[in-house]
Regions:
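A short helix-breaking turn/cap at a secondary-structure junction
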Residues: 99-185, 189, 364-392
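Conserved hydrophobic/aromatic pocket- or pore-lining residues that grip, position, or stack substrates
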Residues: 18, 46, 130, 194, ...
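Acyltransferase
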Residues: 11-19, 155, 181-205, 229-234, ...
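Small-aliphatic-rich amphipathic alpha-helix that forms the alpha element of a beta-alpha
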Residues: 271-274, 305-330
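Gly/Ser-rich catalytic/binding loops embedded in alpha/beta enzyme cores
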Residues: 1-82, 192, 270, 274-275
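Short, surface-exposed loop/helix-turn segments at secondary-structure junctions
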Residues: 1-4, 44, 147, 260, ...
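Short, well-ordered beta-strand elements
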Residues: 122, 339-348, 355-356
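Short helix-loop capping/hinge segments that flank enzyme active sites or metal/cofactor-binding pockets
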Residues: 1, 160-171, 218-273, 285, ...
Length: 392
């Protein structure tokens, strides 16, 4: 509601980069308020349904982008990612989302400039398409303290990589995330179809540690406090429950809490990076649940156990964020309910090019198997028409 009637006078720098590269900007798509949460609904535009079942969520926060891609409304789309904001909707809608290293795509509007966890990235219907958009998005911008010349090292085109030379770690839950039992089963089945193509595939969790949830809660609260404290004081009636929750959590923390979380986050990152002394990438589910009804803000329980807060079901995503890593979410068939299922291919910070190459090659391998190929929504059914029409 805060920006219900707002029309920006200028483009965001990333949009300006896309235009400068020859991109044609079509529209804006729906998100949850200020990108808070994994369900794209808000009090201005309502909820965006999933193209495979409009009664269910498309994910969030970049849910509208994922739907536009899945239904053919747009060939490319931008997304953002803090707790999985482009990876979750990519998984829920059967498209590709890429979380790049901090600073690769400049972000200049953060209230707290020295926070690297929220990034901007590309989304597409294939890894190649996402890479194409990344080339347009990525650039140096002196207003982003994490920006540098890494963009210059991105390949102009993806050539792929021999998966038989790649070592992978496979983790169903990152060693810390609640994951629905049916999603675990689907993940195990899908991994069984492709683990043999790699040079080495070991079942191994990254060492993210038991404090990761508290670390995330504190640092996310800090981020929301820097952006929304004044709004919470002046116009609390215009803020939804998710933004209010994290801003209030930020107010409850002390400087000592924030200092502790900063130190622990550094330890998490270093332990995670050590994994890549022995493997090239980590493969995990891209979402912990099947898409749920968009009428509910978020899952409140999993496997019969209550979830602590509205973000806990996203730990499979924010665990990756807290490690400051690169991650590509790619489609991998459908789950037990016939909804899109995705996996994430993650690497260490700075490994954008190699993660894209591996994800591209794995995507091609998955496309050859009906059980793991990218699913397509029934557009005629969505439009109330007859037989489904194939979409490229």
């Amino acid at each position: 509601l805060v920006y219900a009637d707002d029309v920006p006078a200028t483009d965001d720098p990333v949009v300006a980069n896309i235009r400068a590269a020859g991109g044609i900007v079509l529209c804006k798509t729906n998100t949850p308020e200020f990108g808070a949460g994994g369900n794209s609904r808000n009090d201005v535009h309502g909820a965006t349904g999933n193209p495979f079942d409009p009664t269910k969520t498309c994910g969030g926060s970049s849910g509208g982008s994922a739907v536009a891609l899945a239904t053919g409304m747009a060939p490319l789309a931008t997304g953002s990612d803090y707790g999985g904001s482009l990876r979750t909707p990519s998984s829920f809608c059967g498209v590709v989302g890429f979380r790049p290293s901090p600073g690769l795509v400049p972000s200049v509007d953060k209230a707290a400039a020295l926070t690297p966890w929220g990034v901007i990235g590309p989304m597409g219907r294939s890894v190649e398409d996402a890479h194409l958009l990344l080339l347009a998005q990525a650039d140096y911008d002196k207003r982003d303290p994490f920006s540098g010349d890494d963009y210059a090292r991105l390949p102009e085109a993806l050539s792929g990589i021999d998966l038989a030379s790649v070592r992978v770690a496979i983790s169903a839950d990152l060693g810390c995330a609640p994951v629905d039992s049916n999603i675990r089963k689907t993940f195990a089945e899908r991994v069984g179809t492709f683990r043999g193509v790699f040079a080495e595939a070991q079942d191994r969790d990254p060492d993210l540690g038991p404090q990761i949830h508290d670390v995330f809660e504190i640092l996310r609260g800090l981020t929301f406090l820097t952006s929304h404290h004044d709004r919470l004081k002046k116009t609390p009636d215009k803020l939804g429950p998710n933004v209010t929750y994290h801003t209030q959590r930020g107010l409850e923390r002390s400087a000592a809490d924030v200092a502790w979380a900063q130190v622990e986050q550094g330890k998490i990152m270093k332990r995670y990076m050590a994994l890549f002394d022995e493997v090239d990438v980590l493969i995990a589910p891209a979402a912990s649940v099947s898409p749920f009804p968009h009428s509910q803000w978020h899952p409140t329980e999993m496997n019969g156990e209550k979830l602590d807060n509205y973000m806990r079901w996203l730990a499979i995503s924010y665990g990756i964020t807290m490690a400051l890593t690169v991650s590509a979410s790619i489609p991998c068939g459908v789950d037990h309910l016939g909804m899109p299922f995705g996996i994430q291919v993650a690497g260490p910070n700075g490994s954008d090019a190699i993660v894209l190459e591996i994800a591209h090659s794995l995507e091609r391998h998955l496309a050859a198997n009906k059980a793991t190929a990218r699913p397509l929504p029934n557009l005629n059914k969505l439009a109330g028409k007859g037989k489904p029409k194939a979409m490229a």
